[in-house]
Amino acid sequence: MERDLYGDMADQPIPVGQGVQIRFINDLKENGKPRGKRSKQDSYGVAVRVQGIDGQPFVVLNSGDKAKSSYDYDRHYSERSSTLDTAYSQSSRESAWSRGSQKKTDNGEYPSLGYRSATSQQSTSASNKTNKNGLSTSSFSNQSSEDIDTKPLSSVDSLITKFDVKGQVRGRTARRSQALKDERKRSQSLDGRKNYQDTADSREISLQQQNEVPARRETVSSANRSFARQSLEREDINKTRLTKEWLDQGGEEPVIVKQQRSVQSEFQLKSTPDLLRDQQADGSDPTREMIFSILRDGSTENENNLRKKTSILLEKFPSLQAQPGEDTRSLGSQKKELERKVAELQRQLDDEMKQRMKLESSQGRPKAGMQRLEIQLEESKEECSRLKDLYDKKKNELNAVSQELMEVRMGKEQVETKLRAMEDKLMDSKEELSHLRAKGGTSPDKLALMKELEEVQDELDEVLQIRQKQEELLRQKDRELTALKGALKDEVANHDKDLDRVREQYQNDVQQLRKNMENVSQDQLSLETERQKINQVVRNLQRELEESSDEINQWKEMFQKNKEELRSTKQELLQMKMEKEESEDELKETKDRFSLLQSELEQAKKGSVDPGELASVRKELQRVQDQLKQLSVDKQKVEENLHQRERELSALKGALKEEVAGRGRETERLREQLQSEVVQFKKDNENLGRESQRIQDQLKQVLLEKQRHEEAVHQRERELSALKGALKDEVSGRDREAERLRAQFEQDAMQTKRSYEELVKINKRLESEKVDLERVRQVIENNLQESREENDDLRRKILGLEAQLKETNTFCDDLQRAESRLKDKITKLETERKRMEDTLGEAADQEQELAFVKRDLGNKLEEAQRSLKRLSLEYEELQECYQEEMKQKDHLKKTKNELEEQKRLLDKSMDKLTRELDNMSNESRGSLQVLQSQLEEFREKSRREIGEAQKQAKEKTAEAERHQFNSSRMQEEVQKLKLALQELQVEKETVELDKQMVTQRLQNLEQDTESKKRVQDDRSRQVKVLEDKLKRMEAELDEEKNTVELLSDRINRSREQMEQQRAELMQERARGQDLECDKISLERQNKDLKGRLANMEGQQKPSVNVSHLEAKLQDIQERLQSEEREKATLLSTNRKLERKLKELNIQLEDERLHVNDQKDQLNLRVKALKRQVDEAEEEIERLEGLRKKAVREMEEQQELNEQLQTRLKTMEKESKRKPIRPAHNDDDDLSSDGEYGGSYDPSSITSLLTESNLQTSSC
């Protein structure tokens, strides 16, 4: 409703009204009698008519108590002054009702929160009310952010042409018409009235007097008040910890409570008792009745004419017929929506705190990424609170400036009331003169009185002319002020919309950040579970490796046992061989004997046969046959033992085969499991990389959103500074109009300037914090880059492990092939065994072939020995392969430990970074708290000074009123002298205030220089810290270079060792070839000897050389065995050397890879160090530029200080030299021309203000 009354009425093209009419009811007199004492201190009633922008009258109803209200109504320009006066008196009666309704809300709101008392609102006027209403209504509009005008403010003339198109002249063009006596009596009847007291009795009396007020509206207003009280109680219950801290820190109302209070005040203003009084029970238009009652009071016209005039006014202004129900419903819905939003935000905050508590309880030590995000969230919250504080401060300063403007306007109105009182006195004197003329008579006293009256009339004409000029100036100033107020209103509305939009956007960003934090926490938990799974798998693999090592040890023990058994069987075989040789010798001896016996028998047959000898020969033959039988039995036993040993050997071979097959299956299973774990590890690593990239993108988005917020805040601050500039111009104009309040305004201007400088400092600090955040972000990005490089190193190591796995697979294949070869050899041995069995069967049947069987057995034994040697060698190779596998497992364990060590180092570095970030945030918080405390102290001090100045101003106004009341009874000469004295005192006070202002400015400049010195010292300390960091980095770089040199020395030494091993290997190979040649020659000799032996045995002729040859053959066999043993030892040593060479090659390759990795890491670290050095150099250059800039600013401030000091000295000299003006120039103490002759003309004031603006801009 108020928007329609204020906005739509301003759009109608109505003729511009004339003048400003103000009447203090308590100052009116009746028949020249002095007014009586006031019934109560500071109690008065005032009716003010101020002409609006487009001719719209604006009425302020004010009283001395704590309430205030304002209404708009339309009037014709052609109404005469008597109607205006009566309308004002009627409106003053209506103000009592508005005070009664308003006081209830002012005293009922927030009784225990310690907010500002309502006494500071006594001097506010209608323009402030309209501005506040405009702000409250425009804050709920849905305009977009593109409608904001970011261009600089236009000039005052363009604003006047924008808001005031019509060019008619305001003010009175003629003298004020004489007021009727009954109207003055009516005004005098209001003087003795007491102030309206908001008690139950007064409300009952007022309600009895106003019978037209329907009961329905009272129930609605009481319901609204109860609803507002309940909502406030709910809000007080739902307040959070932050809100309580805000309430404990200061008396400022929160923004939401202010909005609710403005909504409640608007809702209550729409149902004030004076409007309810004029509403009829039959549902007639209250606006029509109000306009009719205004026109009817003090008018002598007919009622029908007045009705026609009201209808014409309503036709011209259709916006007055707005329905209040929709507005109140919309305000109620908006209030409910605000309450719902506050409850929802409170609920979200509680949920977030619960989630954070759960996360902290579940997670013992938060990770570095989570800590960074929490730190950024806390910094964004602190930045939001700082922005809110700045917004509240600016809003409070704007309200204070508007209140001070209203106080200036009230002072102007008081001056105008004094002028009207003088006019009333003149009218009374004219009436007395007319009465005297009517009576007749020309006495000399009457002639003297006539002359005095004519002189007084001439003086009054001069005063009126001066007053008309002053009104013309004031009219122009009012038009400028209204234009500026319109522009200010639009700017403030747009600013509030932008702030609401920024607040909503910030809330959305905070919610998005919370969601991102929850997602990060969930991802972190999932990563933790995956890491636990991987650790479990690694532990299982370690356990399996330990079990496999235990099994390998058991197999080694079994193999050792089998080896010992084989050695024992070999010894037994050798013994059996020796026994067989003995038996063969015996058999030879028996054969020799048998041949001798045969020869003897033949000789005996040839000769004479002796029966004794024949019996002895037969006995000898029987004995030889028995020996042969015994030898055959022994041979069977030996054969049985051989069969048993072969069976044991085949069983051992089968067990060994099964063992090798089991080990192959186990290695295959381990290989598959390791491959699956490697694939899973790769997947987890890729997920970690993607997660880190996503977190980095989220951090970039948060930083971009923060930059946008900071840009919006800077834009709002620029707009506020522009608005402050307009307000300063307005304040300087009002200071020229009201000289008495200039000091207070200048102090307020200085305070706003200091607050602006503090805001600029805070802004710089915010920029520095932004730079620090950028630096921290770069550090985080570098750490992420390092983590990616480490992930690449891990991938390379995993590839190396896969290559090692492939080598183990190939080794397993080689083992399987060796196993197949062993199987073939075993089959060959079995076939040979069968063949040996056949030959042994034939030897049992034919004793003649014992020699051939003996040779075959010898050959087979030799082959068995060679096979046993080969088996033992293959077993040793297998054992060496197992040892190599164990070494590879140890190497894998070492690489795993190195990876864990690197991970621990990474965790330590991340913890160190988080601690540094915490320290930086704590330092920034501490500095911010110190600045806030200093700012609060400065504000308290300025408030106390303003309160003292206001008290002094009130005391001075009271003294001025007393002097004025006494001066009305004194003569004109005394009054002129007193006025001259007052002007001198005012000028002296202005000079003193100017001096104080200059001293304060000097103090501020000194403080600025000290702060800049401190900043310079801090920057020098930062430069020193950066230099120390550079030195530290250079030392680390030297250490890394030394480590690289040591690694290169180790590589050279290992290469030399490899060359030595190769030379030894070549020597061993040459020796092996020589031994092979010797072996081949010995085998040839052996074959020759065996052939010769076979020929000798085939001849069946005993010879003396047989034994010699057999001994020689045995020696040759022993030499051959010893050479074979030496050859076996040489082969084993050769294999060992080859294995060592392979190991050295592998070790060299690993060291080369390790050196390359370290070289890459060192290159990356060198690049990072160079980048840090470049950043440090850039930071040093930037600090040097800032230092130079600060020095230049300090020099400029010193120059300004010197200029101000010279200006102050010249002003003091001019104030001392200035003489007292003559009395005839000081007739009118309220003329605005008197202040142009002083030491402060408008040009000097504007120059000072421009200098202050220049100073703030340079800061």
From Swiss-Prot:
A motif (ZIM) lies at residues 41-55. GO terms for cellular component: bicellular tight junction; myosin complex. It is found in: Cell junction, Tight junction. Residues 80-100, 128-145, 220-229, 1241-1259 have a biased composition (Polar residues). Keywords: Cell junction, Coiled coil, Tight junction. Deletion of the TJP1/ZO1 interaction motif (ZIM) decreases but does not abolish colocalization with TJP1/ZO1. This is Cingulin. It comes from Xenopus tropicalis (Western clawed frog).
